[in-house]
């Protein structure tokens, strides 16, 4: 029996569940494989890179959902989705990112619609709906924290979490609310081994007249992909990038730096702790290989012991 790569629910002989298809569009009856293989998608991404407004280490393509044809069409402009095919060096990034985004959603972290779609060679490609677009052509105002801090791609790691919190205070309409969201995201990224949350992976968005943190994106367990000796956080916290402790994460960052109350911190920790059993279940039914599932579980177990004892 197949499992839907959008919702993770069992879907019989079909490649996608009806629920998964309806998340993309209520009118979508089926979803065809992408017309290119993983290698061909990477070549296409390189050829179109200068036309993409969203760039990074992973190869990316802009796409629209063609409901009539029941498939994603790759486009140069006005795309509503981003496609990320398999990487030629780092294994299983699409499955990794999809799983990690699913885990984030279980604790209330806002994430855009995302999932996996089969390619011509049956490899899995990650898709995510753009949150900076509305309707056919309207762009929603979004700025990443590198822009807010006056940094660029070459200096996106030259900052600290303490300074990032000050940017939240300076730019967000209701910083006290956004600092709770930031705290939850930092705890989550520590637990799942996302050590690459540099300035360009945080953004603010104008929504309903308010400036707030954007939905989360680029969440994945980088620790199990990279070689040993990886750091635990991209931007130093209390001048540390590794050997983070509960005291640093909870008391120093949550209470002192973000100014959160004990009650707020306890609520965040309780929500995460209650979700942990479900996380291990979700890892088990994810589309990662058994080897990568095992690495993900072990890392999560290690980080859980640090945060919760």
Feature roles, as predicted:
Residues 63, 104, 145, 196, ...:
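A residue-level signal for conserved active-site and pocket-lining positions in enzyme catalytic cores
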Residues 144, 148-167, 206-263:
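Catalytic-core segments of enzymes that bind and process phosphorylated/nucleotide-bearing substrates
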Residues 1-41, 45-47, 210-211, 281-309:
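Regulatory N- and C-terminal appendages and interdomain linkers associated
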Residues 238-301:
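Mobile late-domain/C-terminal helix-loop "cap" segments
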Residues 125-130, 215, 277-281:
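A short beta-strand motif that forms the metal-chelation/ATP-contact edge
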Residues 89-105, 160-224:
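Conserved kinase catalytic-core segment
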Residues 39-158:
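Conserved ATP-binding subdomain of kinase catalytic cores across diverse folds
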Residues 120, 127-191, 236, 251, ...:
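ATP-dependent phospho-/nucleotidyl transfer catalytic cores
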């Amino acid at each position: 029996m197949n499992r839907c790569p959008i919702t993770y629910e069992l879907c019989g002989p079909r490649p996608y569940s009806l629920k998964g298809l309806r998340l993309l569009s209520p009118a979508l009856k089926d979803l065809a494989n992408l017309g290119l293989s993983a290698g061909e998608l990477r070549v296409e991404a390189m050829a179109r890179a200068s036309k993409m407004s969203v760039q990074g280490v992973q190869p990316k393509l802009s796409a629209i959902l063609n409901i009539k044809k029941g498939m994603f069409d790759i486009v140069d402009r006005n795309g509503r989705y981003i496609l990320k095919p398999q990487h030629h060096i780092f294994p299983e990034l699409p499955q990794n990112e999809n799983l990690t985004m699913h885990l984030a959603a279980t604790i209330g972290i806002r994430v855009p619609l995302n999932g996996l779609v089969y390619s011509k060679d049956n490899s899995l490609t990650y898709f995510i709906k753009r949150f900076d677009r509305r309707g056919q052509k309207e762009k929603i105002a979004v700025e990443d924290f590198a822009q807010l801090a006056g940094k660029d791609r070459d200096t996106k790691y030259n900052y600290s979490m303490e300074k990032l919190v000050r940017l939240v205070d300076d730019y967000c309409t209701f910083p006290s609310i956004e600092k709770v969201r930031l705290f939850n995201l930092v705890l989550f990224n520590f637990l799942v081994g996302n050590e690459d949350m540099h300035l360009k992976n945080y953004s603010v968005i104008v929504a309903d007249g308010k400036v707030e943190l954007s939905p989360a994106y680029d969440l994945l367990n980088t620790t199990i992909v990279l070689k040993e000796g990886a750091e635990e956080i991209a931007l130093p916290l209390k001048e540390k990038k590794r050997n983070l402790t509960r005291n640093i994460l909870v008391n120093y960052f949550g209470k002192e730096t973000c100014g959160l109350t004990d009650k707020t911190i306890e609520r965040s920790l309780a929500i995460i702790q209650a979700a942990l059993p479900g996380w291990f279940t979700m890892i088990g039914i994810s589309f990662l290989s058994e080897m990568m599932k095992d690495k993900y579980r072990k890392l999560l177990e290690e980080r859980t012991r640090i945060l919760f004892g």
